[in-house]
Swiss-Prot record:
This is Transposase for insertion sequence element IS231B. GO terms for molecular function: DNA binding; transposase activity. Keywords: DNA recombination, DNA-binding, Transposable element, Transposition. Belongs to the transposase 11 family. Involved in the transposition of the insertion sequence.
Amino acid sequence: MNLSIQDELQLFSEELCRHLTPSFLEELAKKLGFVKRKRKFSGSELATIFIWISQRTASDSLVRLCSQLHAATGTLMSPEGLNKRFDKKAVEFLKYIFSTLWKSKLCKTSAISSTALTHFQRIRILDATIFQIPKHLASIYPGSGGCAQTAGIKIQLEYDLHSGQFLNFQVGPGKNNDKTFGTECLDTLRPGDLCIRDLGYFSLEDLDQMDQRGAYYISRLKLNHTVYIKNPSPEYFRNGTVKKQSQYIQVDLEHIMNHLKPGQTYEIKEAYIGKNQKLFTRVIIYRLTEKQIQERRKKQAYTESKKGITFSEKSKRLTGINIYVSNTPEGIVPMEQIHDFYSLRWQIEIIFKTWKSLFQIHHWQNIKQERLECHVYGRLIAIFICSSTMFKMRKLLLQKNKRELSEYKAIGMIQDHVSLLYQAIQRNTQDLTKILIRLFDLLQKNGRKSHRYERKTIFDIMGVVYEYNGFGKQKKAA
């Protein structure tokens, strides 16, 4: 059934309001014990401060927060009284709201149609962002080590590129291990999912599990792993048994690198990774351009100086190539498209960029733990509201106009309307729908993605049919 733009936004409004109306928040605050008797500062007021009216709840003074609260709700609080309300129950309250929101149906109907969707149920992108916090919280949130961070918070996110749906989420200490979280994410795998993983999450065991569960993967290969091919002429013992050490031949990656031109791709279709339990997989080698090599060397030098990490001589020699492993069928993702598909992972970097540049999740003063945690979960709720709205608008803009929405532009414009969204939610879903229709009109006019440099966009790589003004023609990804 094809719904109108208004009908789709009405359904979206109803789902959003279900989690954020004042009456729902009041009941939730009582249920979780944040409010035990009638007070002038309720769950709704707490949500107002941390979700809606202030970007800088961890850095503005308490006097300023009291002023902003009074301007928005008429509630009069002293700085000391307000600070007392930032307690463990307040953290639990905001954490619960965020958890129910990202597990809700807000993004379930936001998936875009694409060639990739016919082959892969979901395209799962996983990454983490980390930021420093006050040093006195180092025992609770130890940082990532080295000379980079004493205390830090790491946020892990896995989401579906088709719909924007959050699949797995974790807020924890900066030192938390990426690989451990990557393994935990396997619990939500479905057959037909495509998982795109970077080196921080690399695990042969995880890749093998994905394959066994009917899911697909594209991952960078860590250079401390050896690539083998089957030996066509192995040695045998007299009794006819194959000599184990002669079953496989090690691939000389450096030799392959030296024979590839910049931008060229080479594939080993039947390769084996690992010394003992060997993973059977495709191995794709992409020769970086000179510009990409210079950027990588610069990044390596920065990592060595700032984090105290020393790259092996082998890693430095193989700087000129990216090595990917994948179990995707060659007919669906040929070797020439592996690098492009892997680059879809960088979409999550755009999301993390908005968290810091637009939502200022990493801004803080020397404050207590509970206030910082309220700030983090409040910002995450605001982020999810804006990002889920963006993904809904992305689908509607494609559906109506066959245009590609700029994620970064759109989230900024939606954030500019947060105060209007807040006011509408205090009233009813009809008013919220009207604001969302206004937003759609704005994004339709000013939110389209620029194609000035003729670079492949996410729509091109995923095979989304859309139109753009570059040459006044329709553009479809291969």
